[in-house]
Each structure stands twice: as C-alpha cells, then as structure tokens.
Design a protein with these regions (language model features):
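Charged, low-complexity, helix/coiled-coil-prone segments
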Residues: 37-48, 52-64, 178-184, 241-259, ...
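Short linear motifs in intrinsically disordered
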Residues: 113-119, 152-153, 264, 276
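Extended, charged amphipathic alpha-helical segments
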Residues: 200-289
C-alpha cells in the first residue's frame, strides 16, 4: 500500500532542510521498503516456498517455483512499452531539440525500465540530471526501494522534495557511508547520514541544481501504486505449494517400501530404529531367514 509522506507547507523552507528530518523520513520509508524488497524478490524467483521445511528431514521436499510474478510483469511491460513512445511536433511548438536530448539520454530504455518498475513495485522514479562536466541533460531510472517523494499537507498534495538514499562501500578501507540526495524545486542537498569510520555526521551541503523543478519524477502504476502481481502473491504461493506437494507425493510413491507382516525388523527397539532408518534411506532391508 502506497504511503504518503507529508510535511507542513506552512513550516517548509527549502533552504533549511536538516539531516535529522531526512533521517526520520528515511526511517519511516524503510517500513515500506521491506515490502518493496519482497515484491522484487518474487520477480527474481525468490519465493516463500524456498524456505519450506518438512518434519521428516529424509522425506522428499521439492521446492518448485513457478515464477508467475516475472511472467505477469514482463508481459504487462511488453504490452505497455513494446512500441516506444512517440513524440511529435505540433502546431504550437517545435520539439526537435527535445527529441535530440531524448535520443542522447536513450529515453526509450529509461521508459522501459520505468514501466518494469511500475509493474514490480507499483511505482517508478526517474532522475533528470546534468552529465558530469557538461550542460547536457541525461535521465535514468532509480530504485524505488531507496527513493520517495515528500508532499505538502494541502488537499492537492503538491510535491515538496524527493529523497534518494543509498550506501557507499570503500573496500580498500573497509568502511561504509550512508548518504542521501535530497532535491527540492531549486536545491540539491548532499547529506552523509552516517559513516562507519566516523559515526554520525552532520554533512548538509546545498547547491542550486538550476532545473527549476524537482528533478525526480514519480510515476504510479495506478492510484494506489499497486504492482501488477502484488495482489496475486498468495495465489503464487499456493500454486508453488500445490506443485511441490504433488511432486513430493510422486517421489514418495516411487520410494515406497514394503510393509512386513508376521515378522519383526529387530529384536530390540534400538535395533528397530536403526532398521527403520535404513528402510527410509535405502528403501531396502534384508531379513535373514
């Protein structure tokens, strides 16, 4: 379920966003991020059935994964973006320069990734930025698990700023930094929230991004930002369980053993346990006459 993160417009000043505020919002978003990670794991074929165990460790335990989640998302994305979006000039304006910029940013690939993210997560985020050392604009799709938009508390829910948070590892020094990029309408904050080599920091650097609007765009799959297979996960789990149980039943039938009447496996309970273990593992037991 999509969670709106809000901030009072009356007290909002884009020039004075603090690390503590951003850290609190990230903590709130993390509760939803765990659900988004689950949606991604189902797309990747990491289903609940893979954690299934049986009381009898020697019994067949096939963990069949029918990845309908990926089938649904890929099919929906193919129908949606099988043909790239076309942009045409109109009588009101010439967009040739925009089309040239789109080609340079490989916008077709960005659109396709956004569509797939919407199918998986129910939402997608596109980041518009200037290439390093250049004035040319580029575009990329960023991970919904680490991105969110903050809205004002008005009836219109106007976006105030966007947050993209991530970790940076330095394997040469065995350190990790947890950073956030915060974008308002006019400013870009780079915040180092925490560093393993120096602890919590107060790094809050704000610079103009000169784009005139928040450079992160949020797209929703629908009003409630529900992914294409999100509400079918319980059915996918049930199907995986059913198929696994069927295979287990077949395997148990193949490995069935003979029931003995009128004789004993052993003279003592301890020897009987040993004999039953041999039967369960080998499916065969020799009884001398």
């Amino acid at each position: 379920m999509y969670q709106y993160l809000t901030y009072p417009r009356d007290g909002y000043d884009e020039g004075s966003l603090k690390k503590d505020l951003i850290y609190k919002l990230i903590t709130i978003h993390n509760t939803e991020s765990s659900h988004l990670k689950k949606l991604k794991s189902y797309y990747m074929g990491e289903h609940a059935i893979l954690k299934h165990t049986r009381r009898n460790v020697n019994a067949p335990n096939y963990k069949t994964v029918a990845n309908h989640a990926k089938d649904i998302a890929d099919t929906a994305t193919g129908y949606f973006m099988g043909n790239p979006i076309k942009y045409n000039n109109t009588a009101d304006g010439d967009i040739d320069e925009l089309l040239t910029a789109f080609d340079g940013a490989e916008i077709d690939q960005v659109d396709a990734q956004n569509a797939l993210n919407m199918a998986i997560y129910g939402r997608a985020y596109e980041y518009i930025y200037a290439k390093e050392g250049l004035t040319e604009l580029d575009s990329t799709s960023i991970d919904p698990e680490n991105t969110f938009m903050v809205y004002d508390d008005s009836i219109e829910r106007k976006p105030l700023f966007a947050v993209y948070y991530y970790e940076v590892k330095d394997d040469t020094k065995d350190t990790t930094k947890y950073q956030a990029e915060v974008f308002t309408e006019n400013l870009h904050y780079h915040m180092v929230l925490r560093s393993t080599d120096s602890g919590t920091t107060q790094s809050e650097e704000a610079t103009p991004h000169n784009l005139g609007q928040i450079p992160i765009i949020e797209y929703r799959n629908n009003h409630f930002a529900i992914g294409d297979y999100e509400q079918q996960i319980s059915l996918i789990d049930a199907y995986n369980s059913l198929m696994g149980n069927r295979v287990n039943d077949k395997e148990q039938a193949v490995e069935s053993i003979l029931v003995l009447y009128g004789t004993q496996l052993a003279d003592t309970p301890e020897d009987a346990k040993v004999a039953m273990k041999i039967l369960s593992e080998e499916g065969l037991l020799e009884l001398p006459g």
